[in-house]
Amino acid sequence: MAKKANPKAKTQKKRKVVVESNGEAHVTASFNNIIISLTNKKGDVVAWSSAGKMGFRGSKKNTPYAAQLAAEDASKVAHEAGMRKVKVYVKGPGNGRESAIRAVHNSGIEVTEIIDITPLPHNGCRPPKRRRV
């Protein structure tokens, strides 16, 4: 016997996020990609983007230009939703950190603070071996 399809299981209700004029921008810049998330004060994501979402692949994802396009994309959506000021939290050693912050500022959102929250070990785990090119 075939099971009947449950119509309620198919549709997912899109959750509404309360957008305030002040928020936070989280820039995560790894060696392989860059991810920008704009959130409200509670931490609910208003808009996000990444270099991979913008169509960059491989080594092109970790470039300042890719970070700039990703930051412009996310901040445009957040600006239309009503966000005007952000604190920027930067994490990671990647290339596009500064260009992402500049792109957020140039898209009409005022940057009030820049905070670096890159995790640094107090000599914890052994790092991967060095590349020899």
UniProtKB/Swiss-Prot annotation:
Keywords: Ribonucleoprotein, Ribosomal protein, RNA-binding, rRNA-binding. One of its GO terms (biological process) is translation. InterPro entries: Ribosomal_uS11, Ribosomal_uS11_bac-type, Ribosomal_uS11_CS, Ribosomal_uS11_sf. GO terms for cellular component: ribonucleoprotein complex; ribosome. It comes from the Bacteria. One of its GO terms (molecular function) is rRNA binding. The keyword Plastid does not apply. Disulfide bonds: none annotated. PROSITE patterns: RIBOSOMAL_S11 (PS00054). It holds the Pfam family Ribosomal_S11. Belongs to the universal ribosomal protein uS11 family. Part of the 30S ribosomal subunit. Interacts with proteins S7 and S18. Binds to IF-3. Located on the platform of the 30S subunit, it bridges several disparate RNA helices of the 16S rRNA. Forms part of the Shine-Dalgarno cleft in the 70S ribosome. HAMAP family: Ribosomal_uS11. This is Small ribosomal subunit protein uS11.
